[in-house]
Amino acid sequence: MRRLRVGKVVEQTLAPRDRALPLAAHADEAVGRLRFALIYVVLMAVLWATVVDDLLAAWLATLPLAEGATTLTLYSPYDWLETRWTAVGLLALLSSLPVLGWQAWRFAYPGLLPSERTWLATYIAVGGVLTLFLILFIWGWMFPRMISAAEIAVTIEGVGLHYDVVALFQMALAMSWLLLLVALAVLALALARMLG
């Protein structure tokens, strides 16, 4: 490595293959990659917005509700709009994970050491697959089982069960974020430990 003196204040250490670029060049690259990723997420959101009602209806149909769809209640139309757009955002982010991961990798690659590259590549790949698996697991298997268990535990004679659609969605979404953040944090720590 050689020492490069930039001005009279800053001193950097560069590897032989490194190039000294001004901070503005890095900022321009970051803005360009963020712009591309944002446009991609917005396009995915537009696509998901066209089918979100059908997807939510299909998901609600998979839930083991006591007496079927007649037990679903919508207490606030504005909350339902928020729910729909939250679902669109979640689906857009999930379907954009490969592009977001690729953009992060391409931006970070030149500045990383080989061990850091291995860690980041593994984290992006395993984290992306883990994220998709956890979301499918929570929404498709875990949440319906929780509703079944709750129905068995709370049966009061003469009292009908009614479910707030927005509350069901918000609870599934909260579980998703909680388990996802814990899983990604554990993955980051495990990879840091394994790869040094």
Descriptions of predicted regions:
Residues 1-196:
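Membrane topogenic/interface segments and analogous intrinsically disordered interaction regions
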